[in-house]
Amino acid sequence: VTVDKDMHILVVDDFYTMTQLVRGLLKSLGFRNIEEARDGGSALQKMAEKSYGLVISDWNMKPMSGIELLRAIRASGDNVPFILVTAENTVENVLEAKAAGVNGYIMKPFNAGTLKSRLVAVLGDF
């Protein structure tokens, strides 16, 4: 299966610089349709209006965290591939994310190679 580089990707983070970093890395990997949301609530609004092929979200955001966003998405029946990004790599976090239905997990800081390996694991080769 070939990954569709025209799929819509939603990057969710409350830090503008992080969304720009992830956007740049995704573009360097050939993805073209990248959108951003500043928090879980605005991400859910965007997802109500459009179908996304992938969501990459920071864990630690206010008022709705990335894990709360993931739970809300899964509760709605949406199985969109979801990658959580976090600076806190604890066994508890990994287990909580897996229980919530996460597809991939990335530790900060990360680079294009790390992102690509996670994307391949979640989406398949490209």
Residues covered by each model-derived region:
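Short hydrophobic/Thr-rich beta-strand motif most characteristic of the beta2 strand and flanking loop
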Residues: F31-R38, K46, I106
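Active-site beta3 strand of CheY-like receiver
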Residues: K50-I56
